[in-house]
Amino acid sequence: MTLITPPFPTNRLRRMRRTEALRDLAQENRLSVKDLIWPIFITDVPGADVEISSMPGVVRRTMDGALKAAEGSRDAGHSRDLPVPLTDPAVKTETCEMAWQPDNFTNRVIAAMKQAVPEVAIMTDIALDPYNANGHDGLVRDGILLNDETTEALVKMALAQAAAGADILGPSDMMDGRVGAIRQAMEAAGHKDIAILSYAAKYASAFYGPFRDAVGASSALKGDKKTYQMNPANSAEALRNVARDIAEGADMVMVKPGMPYLDIVRQVKDAFGMPTYAYQVSGEYAMLMAAVQNGWLNHDKVMLESLMAFRRAGCDGVLTYFAPAAAKLIGA
């Protein structure tokens, strides 16, 4: 696009900023409640259904709390929820069998949500870390994370979530080939209409800390995740990952984290034109909330500005812990 800008005073850019009505006419991007996906922390661990200290205003929810949250999502108009489990350490193992049990707590919550509030689209997180004794997203042997064996486990996990009623599967593990394996398994099992939102460009970021506290993975994690999550210095690699996942059957793609990687969002959207999402992760949320609590930033203004940045960068939607608060301000 070639920009043609007449010289001043023929062109006075402030003309279209003079009143709110004129500013609205010139506004290029808009934020809607339909752009929001709400990650909800869930737990059946006794006494764990409390506010998460590193994420002010965010709580872990029992089954009843999760169902009320889904009802709230429907009523507010952001009818897309992602239940994320805090798993009892007693059931975590290095083989992660609980991840694909049909009656694990996550799958029970998915089924109950779909029965109680069928209008809400349920997205899932497919990775082994909530069930892994060593805190990793995949199976580990002799200090090495096993790609192909992990993919087999993720397929079983995806099938169990699909059977429970999930609408969108979200493989977040960053194993090579897992999107294709999950897509083939869905077709073979008759789940041809279940969508895959691939965490295609997930970086080995320092912004995940509060999330790992929320799901009890911080103390369990042995080492780091740099052998499977992306180097924060890389951008061309993100495009290769996205291209591969689209070819393997992803219906939507995600960049994670969000705000520090909006350049990646823009590149992905421009290159592929696919439905593109980003995750405003726990560290981003905690950073803004800490400034709000100290009186340094205005909660509502900084929340909406941060979410608008995702839309301006090319996101079709945002996974954000701000979803309920943002929905109240935006309105249906």
Curated annotation (Swiss-Prot):
Claim: Lyase is one of the keywords in the record: yes
Example of a GO MF term: porphobilinogen synthase activity
Catalytic-site annotation from UniProt: 202, 256
Binding-site residues, 5-aminolevulinate 2: 282, 321
Keyword set, alphabetical order: Heme biosynthesis, Lyase, Porphyrin biosynthesis
Record GO cellular component, one term: cytosol
EC number of this enzyme: 4.2.1.24
Catalytic reaction annotation: 2 5-aminolevulinate = porphobilinogen + 2 H2O + H(+)
Known pathway: Porphyrin-containing compound metabolism; protoporphyrin-IX biosynthesis; coproporphyrinogen-III from 5-aminolevulinate: step 1/4
Pfam hit, one: ALAD
GO biological process: protoporphyrinogen IX biosynthetic process
InterPro entries: ALAD, ALAD_AS, Aldolase_TIM
Residues that hold 5-aminolevulinate 1 according to the record: 212, 225
CDD domains assigned to the protein according to its UniProt record, in alphabetical order: ALAD_PBGS_aspartate_rich (cd04823)
The protein's enzyme class: lyase
Family classification: Belongs to the ALAD family.
Function: Catalyzes an early step in the biosynthesis of tetrapyrroles. Binds two molecules of 5-aminolevulinate per subunit, each at a distinct site, and catalyzes their condensation to form porphobilinogen.
Note: Does not seem to have a metal requirement for activity.
NCBIfam families: PRK09283.1
Subunit structure, as described in the record: Homohexamer.
Protein's UniProt name: Delta-aminolevulinic acid dehydratase
Organism: Rhodobacter capsulatus
Annotated gene: hemB
